[in-house]
């Protein structure tokens, strides 16, 4: 009986360490000539759109499992700036807003993540995710090279980077791509220079 218990403990330890190692193994993700490549092999991104801010945190795991059950291998998420910086200079990445926890949870379920941090995301969200307080600055020109706007975008992106940089696929995480901005140029008045700067 004692030998069986020891054998089970050894087996459990091996499984625990091998699964932990598998979750933190660095990978190489790149665009090939005609397809995406993961560790040099063709990889088809089968993605589901899942907005962590629209799902109570208690249901995150269930929703990720549902996406996986549908045959998806990737979750796409928007990062709504106006949720994370409701007051200028005060950032919240905790609880319901914990994007790193959401990405790690997706990784535990064997899913990759495509992050779309905006700054503008649209997604039928108030001001496309831009915080209301940007409009307190007289004559601010959103989604342009306006100095105040670009300064605030830079600060926000750095805060997002602090949360997510360690979760990139090449660092053992599951973030395979980042899409900056959304629907840029759709209205014919957007200036391409601000997109290049971001």
Sequence positions of predicted segments:
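The substrate-binding groove and active-site-proximal loops of carbohydrate-active enzymes
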Residues: 46-56, 81-97, 136-154, 181-191
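An active-site-proximal structural segment forming one wall of the substrate-binding cleft
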Residues: 99-115, 138-175
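Conserved, mostly hydrophobic/aromatic
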Residues: 40, 75, 106, 160, ...
